[in-house]
Swiss-Prot record:
Record protein name field: Pepsin A
Any matching Pfam family: Asp
PROSITE patterns associated with the record: ASP_PROTEASE (PS00141), PEPTIDASE_A1 (PS51767)
Location in or out of the cell: Secreted
Any one of the GO CC terms: extracellular region
Gene: PGA
Family: Belongs to the peptidase A1 family.
Listed EC numbers: 3.4.23.1
GO BP: any one term: proteolysis
Enzyme class: hydrolase
Active-site residue list: D92, D275
Keywords noted in UniProt: Aspartyl protease, Digestion, Disulfide bond, Hydrolase, Protease, Secreted, Signal, Zymogen
Propeptide: 16-60
Species: Rhinolophus ferrumequinum (Greater horseshoe bat)
Amino acid sequence: MKWLLLLSLVALSECYIYKVPLVKKKSLRKNLMEQGLLQDYLKTHSINPASKYLKEAASMMATQPLENYMDMEYFGTIGIGTPPQEFTVIFDTGSSNLWVPSVYCSSPACSNHNRFNPQQSSTYQGTNQKLSVAYGTGSMTGILGYDTVQVGGITDTNQIFGLSETEPGSFLYYAPFDGILGLAYPSIASSGATPVFDNIWNQGLVSQDLFSVYLSSNDQGGSVVMFGGIDSSYFTGNLNWVPLSSETYWQITVDSITMNGQVIACSGSCQAIVDTGTSLLSGPTNAIASIQGYIGASQNANGEMVVSCSAINTLPNIVFTINGVQYPLPPSAYVLQSQQGCTSGFQGMDIPTSSGELWILGDVFIRQYFTVFDRGNNQVGLAPVA
């Protein structure tokens, strides 16, 4: 009996899932709108969501556009250093680097956020490597260092990360996050940096080489990133597994996109990235323009595609067929409701690749489907949320 108890305890310990709660906050776009700064920002900054996926090969000077995070609403807390210094970050499956503001940065954008102080960490190790994160007309520049990162109860030692030294421009002052924690593949990591999850797995800190994401539609909370396991209480039915078509981003093949049984986009298949770091559902501008027309969306002065809220009751599902399985998006998912009105969850952008133009399955899609990012088998698992 004692042996049975011991074996069950070992099994439980091997399957332990480390969870990071995600809090839903107002997006940077909404903060800028409330401050009356959005119009000025849009005039001086060219927002190109595609730029995130058009980076040149990783180099010593990393560049990662920040405009892509304008509409992000889900954020989690990590600790860096010994003792840990807390930071609010975006858990981003569309990038691979970790960076946060540092005390070396004195710009207003940095002063309004948590800043890492290497001198207050007994485990920090500096390097001579530089980092650059581009946005609009300027860029955040910084250095790379190593330290211990606390994430969801995991102690990730000797983790490389970026420390900002300059953050020009005023818009980052209102950002609801301090930094970014990338969860894509090492092949797209800037400066040859080892991504956080790779470092965690290499140290044997989780029992399964995967992590999973649940994004709640609830404004209060409930969203979570889980490292090292799958919690079936967050979804219904079985997970459907989709092999990756590229081990860079979490890239998969979509068979077709239909409405009322008719193909409206992605005829003959297309490539898509499952990206927690993109709020909307993005695709080629021509295809998205057609979809916006189907759902009656029109652009307002803030660059948003406005939809009549009453249309939610009459619009049809938009169905993504992936690896032979249909994933319907109801209008309540792709029409975003707020106190200011209703907007389309679709966004046009052009990302040409050798295999055609890319689609981005962002939070609009992930809110409907519990997602497993399986590094061990290079696949994505999808199931309807519970």
